[in-house]
């Protein structure tokens, strides 16, 4: 691969990162709009809280450590978010009868509405993404998959060991 091609790939990668940041900023507004159309009055104020609700809805019963592991968040961050979600009545905490040490979470009716709306929006995005992928051949899709797997592994390794700029293998 030529240096020019590598530079073009890198430039597009940086552009993709910037677009992703911009998209993240508009996703919450889009969620608010959809919620209003569905008559969902109360909504968490950030996407991380919405994703915690989603994680709880997908994995009930789940505890703080489970949410932290599945979402790659610190336990302290999950505690802060879950405390707020309990106060806002999106989730409840409880203990299992056979385990009084662990605190588990489940969705309230209000939280279930957020979960359902979030699932609906994700399904729409997933379908659109699959339609986009259909424009590529099987071989191209395999190359994209390999690239994304290796890039994700590299970025995850950077986060866990703090080593920036590791080359992709």
Curated annotation (Swiss-Prot):
Organism: Bacillus subtilis (strain 168)
One annotated GO molecular function: DNA-binding transcription factor activity
Function: Represses the expression of the yvmC-cypX operon, which is involved in pulcherriminic acid biosynthesis. Also negatively regulates yvmA, yvnB and its own expression. Positively regulates yisI expression. Acts by binding specifically to a 14-bp palindromic motif, the YvmB box, which is present in the promoter region of the target genes.
DNA-binding region residue numbers: 64-87
Phenotype caused by lack of the gene: Deletion of the gene induces changes of proteins involved in cellular processes depending on iron availability. In iron-rich medium, mutants overproduce a red pigment after entry into the stationary growth phase.
Domain HTH marR-type residue range list: 10-153
Induction: Up-regulated in response to iron starvation. Negatively autoregulated. Also repressed by CcpA in stationary growth phase.
InterPro entries linked to this entry: HTH_MarR-typ, Metal_resp_HTH_trans_reg, Tscrpt_reg_MarR-type_CS, WH-like_DNA-bd_sf, WH_DNA-bd_sf
Protein name, UniProt field: HTH-type transcriptional regulator PchR
Single biological process term from Gene Ontology: negative regulation of DNA-templated transcription
Subunit structure, interactors included: Homodimer.
Keywords in alphabetical order: Activator, DNA-binding, Repressor, Transcription, Transcription regulation
Taxonomy, superkingdom: Bacteria
